[in-house]
Amino acid sequence: VIVDSPLSSTSLWLTGPTRSGKTTRLVTEVRRWVELAWPDDLPQPVPPDSRQDAPPERHRERDTPRLFDRALTLSILGSETAKRQYRAGKLLLLTANSDNRQDLLDRLGEVTRQAYPLRATTPLGFFQAEVLLFWPLLIQQLHLRPQFPIRLRPETEQDLATRLWRSLGLSPSILPGSPNEARQVRHLLDLFQLAAFSGTPIEDIPAYLSRGLVSGGETGLAVSWSEVGALLQAWRSWCLARGLLTYGLIGELYGRYLLPLPAYRYHLHRRYRVVLADDVDDYPAIAAQLFQVMQQQGAVGVFTFNPEGAVRLGLGADPAAFTAVAQHCQVEPLPQPAVTSLGQTWAEPIVAMVQDPTMGEPLPEAIQSLQTVARSQLLRQTAEIIIQAVQAGEVEPQEIAVIAPGMDAIARYTLTEILTKQGLAVESLNEQRPLASLPRVRALLTLLALVYPGLGRLVDREGVAEMLVVLGRQIDPVRAGLITDHCFEPHPDTPRLLPVNAFPRWDRLGYAATTAYEQILHWLEDQQTQQAQRVLASPIVLLDRAIQTFLWQGNQPPYAQVAALRELMETAQHYWEVAARLQAETALLSPTPDTRLPTSDAVQVLANFIQLLRSGAVTANPYPVRQAGAAQSAVMLANVFQYRSSRRSHRWQFWLDAGSPRWLTGSDALFGAPLFLSTWSGGAWTTADQLALYEQRLERILRDLLGRTGERLFLCHSDLAVNGQEQMGPLLTLVNAALPVPMSATSELTSGS
């Protein structure tokens, strides 16, 4: 049990706009605590005297003397530093994403001099770790099968849910495999995740939908609300029976079952008596429940809140849910930005101009507009302004950010090509290109289909030719095409490559290309022999061998290629692990203690894996998500959501497609998200409500981005969008009011291009 104590009066709630010094103030408060030996004032656990909150009987006699004889423990520790560490327990540090976590962890490590154990994670990472750690409690409470859980990746979750619901008859009007089916499945899974993060029981989802939404419609669901509840509960039961965890299931297990348990709360307070939470405006509602429990137990906390943030509103975040947490803290407003930015002076006038175009006023010289007719002209002139400014020494590449409401592939490619040709590096923030868009990954998938029988329909001539070019460095595309035309033998079950002399004029290939092809051919034959003899353990081993033999070869590939290969291996390992678990459930797993599947099942799993990757569902985002070492000197390309999530700032910002309507309507909110916010009235969600939500989001975006702009802002607008339609977005008033970029800034380079 925990000593009854009033809610901590030393907890701080730091609120302020973008770059107002909230995180710095958090670090300063921790430094003050360390210098003043603050752990002396923290409430400590005492021996349990109530059976309700006590640990299980079998642990009580063993744990009580060691954990709760405080005087004996402190006397054994001896040094004052060790005593302070014992009183403080472990510090829980929560951040909105992993990049912010690492930055803040480095700063706190310097302040505490590594004297206190510090656990740094994200809210979702914390929920997942707690569910895994206390899985035995959940097994006992929910009467689950005792097996270690496996967390499903989102792409695997969608794949398995689609197959389950297809077998249950998702909807007769939905064509299996169609884009509409994928969208319907994604909507259902998102509803489960939103309900879990908001603390809403899964049984109440149909009632929420019936009160807030109109059934059907272009963006609605093709099933009735009662069917939504039945499908979600079937999916939930299916996952729990097999020990599979999704993000939504993790949120439900933690918020609904684990957090209310007295035994868990007991261990929670024993481990954490200090919580540091940065950017709580991006946390889900169940995180607010966690903080309230910790406050009731007497924990000390520092929380930072940005009213202009809420980047993940609509994706599970619920800023209004933390009002109850703030009520039990000492609120410290930080109204003024700690650094100079355009937002200090111009945030209010710009927001007013966007909300009411008739209130226009001249914008300063620091805000300029670049207007063209075609988008191709806009991209080129934007790049040329950046090149000229860097060459003139006005700004460094790492001080420039190009931000768009939707950074499409054409814009990324065009800007990257122009800037890199002038010697400027480009950083695409969380580009998330599908793995199947990379030639090396496509080559490895073709290789898998050639080694394992029964996958011939997944191999074509173009794929084989590309594989030869990628794996055989001495084979150019022309020779690869000749080899494929004469030496590739298609077959539904056993496609194969023939010896080079099957090409009558093989002498035209040359020695280098012939040698490279024969090396690939002999390697394939060796792997096929091992696979037939059941020596090849799994496709994961084959992928690793292929990478080591053909792609690595002792050199160091670029980071982007390494990240793609790592993500491919991580995805393959995860997919095979899940397949082995599912096969074990149906008693089809071989009796050997490894993860080998029966041959027919392994081929089917491999076919599904190849099709999943080729569908573009998997992107290259392995762990860690950023490159180690010093930040490179590069121009940043990002969309609005990615840039705001990264919490970065730049001297110069270029707002690409400033006239696009996506600044207002380009929300990434999940289906039905407003119904699971604590601010929802409980009535029908109307078009007026949605418009008000869009306008509030646009205001937050403007204030946030202006607060991250140091000196110059360029509003880049083309009359025609990439699809040829005229752009009439909400920021067009700003584009027309801003001073145009001087013609000398672009005329010289444009005339020479």
Model region roles, listed by residue range:
Residues D657-N736:
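C-terminal accessory regions
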